[in-house]
C-alpha cells in the first residue's frame, strides 16, 4: 500500500495561548507562531498541529467554537492565519487545525437561531427533545458531570443535548443539511491552503438516539453514556 504524506511526517504540536505573545497582552498569538517557523523547520518538523484558534467564548479552551470561519481575536486575525499557512508552506510545513464538530458553542449563529425556533431549520442542526415525567429526556450524564440535557429557555419541557458543558450543544450528525454545512466549511479551509485538521471528540459523533434511561452508575442516578 502506498503511504500518504501523513504516514511519514514529523509533527510539532503548538498550544498558541502559551507559545509566544508578540503584542504584550499576555496571550500567545499566530504572529508568535510565524516568528518561530524557521526554528520549527530546523527541528525537522513538516507538520504543525495548532491547538484551537477558532473564534470562541473560551468556556472550554477554544473547543467551543462560535465561528468556524474566523479566528479568535486573542490570537489574531484571518489575515494572520493566511500568512501562517503561506509562510509555513514556503518551508515545507503543513498546518493542521484542531477542529471540533461534535458540538458548537452556544454562541454560534446556528444555535442562537435554533433557540429562537427549536423546530425550524437550525433547530434540526442540534438535538432537542421533550422531557419525561418532569425530568430530562433520559438519565445520560455529561462528561463534565450532571445531566447531558439542558432546559431550553422559554420552554417548560424542552431540552437540548450537550455531552460536554451546557455551553457546547451537540450537533445533529443525523441531519444531512448539517453535514453539508460542515463539509463546505472544511473545503473552504482547504482552499485557503490548510494542510488538514485534527478532529477532536470524533468518536462522539454517532449516538444511539433511543433516549432510554440507562442503569444508574452513581448516586446522582445518571449514567455516563459517553466514554
Predicted regions and their residues:
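Active-site and adjacent substrate-binding regions of carbohydrate-active enzymes
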Residues: 1-227
